[in-house]
UniProtKB/Swiss-Prot annotation:
One of its GO terms (molecular function) is 5-methyltetrahydropteroyltriglutamate-homocysteine S-methyltransferase activity. This is 5-methyltetrahydropteroyltriglutamate--homocysteine methyltransferase. CDD domains: CIMS_C_terminal_like, CIMS_N_terminal_like. Transmembrane segments: none annotated. It is an enzyme of class 2 (transferase). Belongs to the vitamin-B12 independent methionine synthase family. It comes from the Bacteria. It comes from Lactococcus lactis subsp. cremoris (strain SK11). The lineage of its organism: Bacteria, Bacillati, Bacillota, Bacilli, Lactobacillales. The gene is metE.
């Protein structure tokens, strides 16, 4: 039985890629030096896979930024405004991802969206009338040859044409028909080139197949591959799917001339039933995704073997991961502070390679010692249940999830209490974390800085941050979050039930890596988490300072969740803990409390029929539970970013927050139309500039954005803010950008008042 994975993490076990890229962006190393780091990371990945017994090591899973962006470059799908910059290929890629600004040019970054239901983000391809598909697969071919030279016969992977078409933005009436023929031609060129190099396999990733499909989309997929597979010659082609099942098109797909089909048996709820009902062709390999590529818990071998047995008499099975391993950390080997007893329950990417091999060994060779060892792990009670917490959740009633008075009624109380101008200006929460801030936090963690000295340092930074905001002229201030390393980890560290790693980093986008905490047991709040800093900040200014919290859904979605209880139960545990913090902030005199739900959309099922019963019916009430007991005059804010929210606007309104800020700048404010169409009641702050790009927007640019918003929404409903927190930016970008934001807002206010007179 062969062993396979879909892809391996590219950031390196110590984030080597992140640090090399940041040096390159600062012009501290050359492209050649950057490429050396990349080559070392690829070699390490292939070695790890081969040593673990993987029969099909993967190539072209490496990327300097994003695999969808790599495909756009390979297909020549580069908008003219980026071509005019006359940059080399690598710097063009970075301009698309990050924007580009110099004395002569000022080009915004392309929009960034969540990759299906994960916390990874992709750069959205743009198709216009000017788009001309031109195949240049040198990256894929070079990396395949690089592996071959190093002694590894790899299976290159690439996102497929169907998923590319589904994910792309189409401008000015253009449809996929405009580029379809050339797109198929480009992949045909790749087939020929890989054949000429002696390539054995090509993996084509088509995750868009697990979304709800229309009849037209099913026909589009069949049309593409009936044409494309005629040209495969000796090359074997694997259709790889993940994040769900193929219930809309399985019967048609298995008739196509693929040599292998990869199915997800972890998130694909219907995958086993589809194979049982319609069979699986004997002339193809079934790449069975049975090792979870998205969570860090050990595989339960007995359950996996039972699943494989349920597939029936299929001889041609390859043991595979359910999705790319880029969604989990690289290895547990670096976790020297966690006990062996705890680590035994975890499998990061390298450990999942071993799991794939062991499942194959048990299945084929009936290796009972491996199976017995795994069974012993699951036979023990890992954690003790918190009976008191369970009873608290059981006794929740409908009243616990409803805030009174209503949104409209309490708005009058808030206007009176806060006395804010039209178009109130604010930021999303965090301010730039300078090397000085990170150094002090590290010294405190290591015991090199006393608690009193560290707190004095933080108080000084908060004062500076407040003074900066007052000088700029912002209306609602934040304390800057200098005490926080990460918006989830910071809370997890103060909640019982979480455990933490040292180096379990996962790529979120580009150079941005996150270290998700792990939900180990039942979650409770032993003491206040943020009150100390919010209360101190409010004591330093007469302007309102927002209390800053992360919401329960986001905390869970950006953690590695338990698999022994439901996501709903874990979320309600978190909601009760955050509710306690909200009420403590209110008691401390904080009049505006922001409860971020940046990741609300993330775990939304990919199929619309599952949205409510599987997710929204409990995730939205969990948010309401957090703030249901506050006073009418306390204003509740929330923030959401980098997802498509247009189709769940009624559910977002049902969160019953008083103000919601959205990412909107990269997506050309498209969400505004959806808000208007759904008669959205909540006050809104659509982000007026993109903080994920280093470019500085002019006040005129922000003014134009504001005017676009006010053409569609009443001025009384609008707040003005950037589209996300400022932690990852520098002061040299943040200060002028916020200054321009306030200047633009004041101009629009002045014009509005003059017009009204």
């Amino acid at each position: 039985m062969k062993k396979s994975i879909i892809a391996f993490p590219r950031i390196g076990s110590n984030r080597e890629l992140k640090f090399a890229l940041e040096k390159y962006f600062r012009k501290e190393i050359s492209e050649a030096e950057l490429q050396i780091v990349a080559k070392e990371l690829r070699l390490e990945s292939w070695k790890s896979q081969k040593e673990a017994g993987i029969d099909y090591p993967i190539s072209n899973d490496f990327s300097f930024y994003d695999q969808t962006l790599d495909l756009s470059i390979a297909l020549g799908v580069i908008p003219e405004r980026y071509k005019k910059l006359k940059l080399n290929e690598l710097d063009t890629l970075f301009a698309l991802a990050r924007g580009f600004q110099d004395e002569e040019n000022d080009v915004k970054a392309r929009p960034m969206k969540k990759w299906f239901n994960t916390n990874y983000h992709y750069i959205v391809p743009e198709i216009s009338k000017e788009t001309v598909i031109k195949a240049n697969f040198s990256k894929l071919l070079n990396e395949y040859q690089e592996a071959k030279t190093a002694g590894f016969e790899t299976r290159p992977t690439i996102i497929g044409p169907y998923t590319f078409l589904i994910l792309a933005d189409y401008l000015s009436g253009v449809t996929e028909d405009a580029i379809l023929s050339d797109l198929i031609g480009a992949y045909t060129v790749l087939f020929d080139q890989l054949n000429n190099l002696g390539g054995e396999w090509l993996q084509i990733e088509e995750p868009a197949l697990v979304l709800d499909q229309t009849e037209e989309e099913q026909q589009l997929f069949i049309k593409i591959y009936q044409e494309l597979l005629k040209n495969k010659n000796k090359l074997k082609v694997l259709l790889q799917t993940y994040f769900g099942d193929l219930r809309d098109s399985y019967q048609e797909i298995i008739k196509l001339d693929f040599d292998g089909i990869g199915l997800d048996f972890v998130e694909g709820r219907e995958s086993v039933k589809l194979v049982q009902k319609y069979g699986f062709p004997q002339d193809k390999l079934l790449f069975a995704g049975v090792v979870n590529g998205k969570n860090i818990w050990r595989n339960h071998y007995q359950k996996t073997l039972s699943l494989l047995k349920d597939l029936g008499n299929i001889d041609n099975i390859v043991i595979n991961t359910s999705c790319s391993l880029q969604h989990v950390p690289v290895t547990t080997e670096n976790e020297i502070k966690l006990s062996k007893e705890i680590l035994n329950h975890f499998a990061f990417a390298k450990e999942k390679l071993v799991e794939v091999s062991e499942i194959s060994e048990i299945y084929v060779k009936k290796n009972t010692s491996l199976l017995d060892k795994n069974i012993a792990l699951f036979d023990k009670n890992r954690v003790q249940e918190n009976i008191q917490l369970k009873q608290k959740i059981t006794h929740l009633t409908d009243k616990d999830f409803i805030r009174t008075p209503s949104l409209v009624e309490r708005r009058a109380d808030q206007i009176k209490a806060l006395r804010l101008p039209l178009l109130p200006t604010t930021t999303i929460g965090s301010f730039p974390q300078t090397p000085e801030v990170r150094k002090a936090r590290l010294q405190y963690k290591r015991g090199e800085l006393s608690k009193s000295d560290y707190e004095a340092f933080l108080e000084e930074k908060i004062k500076e941050c407040l003074e900066l905001q007052e000088n700029i002229g912002l209306d609602v201030l934040v304390h800057g979050e200098f005490e926080r390393n990460d918006m989830v980890e910071y809370f997890g560290e103060q909640l019982d039930g979480y455990i933490f790693t040292q180096k379990a980093w996962v790529q979120s986008y580009g150079t941005r890596c996150v270290k998700p905490p792990i939900v180990w047991g039942d979650i409770t709040r032993p003491q206040a988490m943020t009150v100390r800093w919010s209360a101190y900040a409010q004591s330093q200014t007469s302007k309102p300072v927002k209390g800053m919290l992360t919401g329960p859904v986001t905390i869970l979605n950006w953690s590695f969740p338990r698999e022994d209880i439901s996501l709903k139960e874990s979320t309600l545990q978190l909601a009760l803990a955050v509710q306690e913090e909200v009420l403590d902030l209110e008691k401390a005199g904080i009049k505006i409390i922001q409860i971020d739900e940046a990741a609300l959309r993330e775990k939304l099922p990919l199929r619309r029929s599952d949205w409510y019963s599987e997710y929204l019916d409990w995730s939205i009430p969990a948010f309401r539970l957090v703030h249901s007991k506050v006073k009418a005059e306390t204003q509740i804010h929330t923030h959401m970013c980098y997802s498509e929210f247009e189709d769940i606007i009624p559910s977002i309104d049902a969160m019953d927050a008083d103000v919601i800020s959205f990412e909107a700048s990269r997506s050309q404010l498209s969400i505004i139309d959806a808000l208007k169409a759904h008669h959205f009641q909540t006050l809104v702050g659509p982000g007026v500039y993109d903080i994920h790009s280093p470019r500085i927007p002019s006040s005129q640019e922000i003014k134009i954005q504001l005017e676009k918003i006010l053409n569609k929404l009443p001025i009384e409903q609008v707040w003005v803010n950037p589209d996300c927190g400022l932690k990852t930016r520098g002061n040299k970008e943040t200060i002028p950008s916020l200054t321009h934001l306030v200047e633009a807002t004041k101009e629009v206010r002045k014009e509005k008042i003059t017009y009204d007179k």
